[in-house]
Amino acid sequence: MSEPIDLSQISPSLKAEILAEALPYIRRYHGKTVVIKYGGNAMTEERLKQGFARDVILLKLVGINPVIVHGGGPQIDQALKKIGKQGTFIQGMRVTDEETMEVVEWVLGGEVQQDIVTLINHFGGHAVGLTGKDGGLIHARKLMMPDRDNPGEYVDIGQVGEVEAINPAVVRALQDDAFIPVISPIGFGEDGLSYNINADLVAGKLATVLNAEKLVMMTNIPGVMDKEGNLLTDLSAREIDALFEDGTISGGMLPKISSALDAAKSGVKSVHIVDGRIEHSVLLEILTEQPFGTMIRSH
């Protein structure tokens, strides 16, 4: 596990250098939207949670518009365990029956989201929580999961959705009024059902629709790793396809990297996978020139 950066040990002169280094990036991203997929340890360790809240407040203060899409897998697992249910995953997607969907809505749209909003507001920011059902934000359709063992057939994984369309009006309205949107990845379908959507997929689609300058996806590893455990700092579409094919990218990383690549192909100028276990990883990625995590390229 990466050692956290101990900011208390940084000298005043080095802090001044860091601030000076950030100025060109503040100018570059001023007035631009940055979508952040927030998840993993950064959502469960108190030190990292507080650091993240301060980071997004600082981004807003210097004129950058952060939009947060959060996950909550561990919290959902804990809630399911309390009612005697075991989480099941297929190709990185949670199988979601009706009872599980009720838990997902309660945990993501309630407990997890409000924790994030409360912490940002506590430190002086102005955050507003939304689900994809608010303001018609995320229109969803049922996800048909291809059966890898039976080509041409599909596996029913319940109320799991994919993004059919995004109406960004409510997000733009919040940005115009200087709020920080915090979005739970729950969509609504024409059938009247709620759908559990992978947060990585929502973040990628939202970044595209908002014409975001950058998409940052936080995870619990340094970035995309090869089979020997080495960090891959820069990946093209062709290289990613090869990593899918040989199984290097698997499980929960499948939707994350697929979404990141789709966003890059759709015009999001900068897409990065970063280690959320490192304190202030979002600021390090956005406001410094230090190579950090894995950059995803469309070509």
UniProtKB/Swiss-Prot annotation:
Pfam families: AA_kinase. Pathway: Amino-acid biosynthesis; L-arginine biosynthesis; N(2)-acetyl-L-ornithine from L-glutamate: step 2/4. The keyword Transport does not apply. The record marks K37, K256 as: Transition state stabilizer. One of its GO terms (molecular function) is ATP binding. The keyword ATP-binding applies. It is found in: Cytoplasm. Its EC number is 2.7.2.8. InterPro entries: AceGlu_kinase-like_sf, AcgluKinase_fam, ArgB, Asp/Glu/Uridylate_kinase, NAGK-C. Its main location: cytoplasm. Gene3D superfamilies: Acetylglutamate kinase-like. Substrate binds at G72, G73, R94, N196. GO terms for biological process: arginine biosynthetic process via ornithine; L-arginine biosynthetic process. Belongs to the acetylglutamate kinase family. ArgB subfamily. This is Acetylglutamate kinase. It comes from Burkholderia thailandensis (strain ATCC 700388 / DSM 13276 / CCUG 48851 / CIP 106301 / E264).
